């Protein structure tokens, strides 16, 4: 296939345009350019898998570090609750109504925006100059492969956090409704998938960068700003686990379906270098 003929270190490396030399060096340090790295997959899955492996320091290791931090925090909280049992009741009360708070937490730990930026700087900025790479079939097939990778990367810390919250809820006295446990768990995963889809969809629909890796889309900045403001506002909301969890799961499913439809409908027209 065409992509294998041009899949060189230059095309899978950091942009060589007018971005700052310091930024280039920082990114390069986190990229593995070992030509021995390969993949057993085929087609667009091969292309994407090779990208992920070469950028494991930038993508996977970041998610793993966040996961270890979360494990550490959960362990410390469990230890405090064991040593000071009277904190359990208050902690339980907080957990029962603080699920909206974790919308902001999930926004902060999600690597979707960072992954999208890496995709452009270290791959798309070069590949988008090839006509075949802008063909609808190529764009949509590669989008599907990338979405799988982004969701997988972000689900690692999300799974750890979801498990930890269920554990803390249980050891602090639990809940009178057993359904709260799976709702709490799956709502955290739903948030993770939501942000993974959200950042990648924005990248494909509003592709903000030009050939010099400069952001040229005001709409992209506004969309990210509104996302931040919405998540920040969630810090003030107090709603029971069952109510907010169900709303979160349903909203995430609906949003993802609509977003994926928009990508399939419009990305072939919008995914190109900005002038």
Q: Positions of the model-derived regions?
A:
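Glycine/proline-centered hinge or cleavage motifs at structural transition points of membrane proteins
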Residues: 132-136
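Hydrophobic alpha-helical transmembrane segments of membrane proteins
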Residues: 1-127, 138-275
């Amino acid at each position: 296939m065409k992509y294998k003929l041009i899949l060189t270190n230059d095309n899978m490396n950091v942009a060589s345009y007018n971005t700052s030399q310091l930024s280039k060096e920082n990114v390069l340090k986190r990229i593995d350019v070992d030509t021995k790295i390969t993949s057993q997959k085929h087609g667009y899955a091969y292309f994407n898998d090779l990208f992920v492996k070469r950028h494991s320091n930038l993508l996977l290791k970041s998610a793993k570090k966040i996961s270890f931090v979360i494990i550490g925090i959960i362990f410390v909280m469990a230890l405090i609750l064991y040593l000071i049992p009277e904190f359990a009741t208050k902690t339980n009360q907080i957990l029962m109504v603080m699920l909206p708070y974790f919308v902001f937490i999930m926004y902060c730990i999600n690597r979707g925006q960072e992954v999208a930026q890496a995709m452009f700087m270290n791959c798309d900025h070069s590949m988008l100059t090839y006509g075949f790479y802008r063909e609808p079939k190529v764009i949509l097939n590669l989008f599907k492969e990338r979405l799988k990778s982004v969701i997988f990367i972000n689900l690692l810390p999300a799974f750890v956090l979801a498990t930890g919250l269920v554990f803390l809820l249980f050891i602090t006295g639990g809940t009178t409704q057993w359904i709260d446990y799976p709702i709490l768990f799956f709502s955290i995963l739903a948030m993770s998938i939501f942000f993974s889809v959200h950042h990648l969809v924005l990248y494909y629909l509003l592709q903000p960068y030009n050939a010099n890796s400069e952001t040229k889309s005001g709409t992209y900045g506004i969309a990210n700003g509104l996302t931040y403001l919405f998540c920040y506002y969630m810090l003030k909301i107090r709603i029971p686990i069952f109510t907010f969890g169900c709303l979160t799961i349903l909203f995430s499913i609906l949003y993802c379906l609509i977003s994926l439809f928009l990508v399939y409908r419009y990305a072939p027209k919008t995914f190109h270098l900005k002038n």
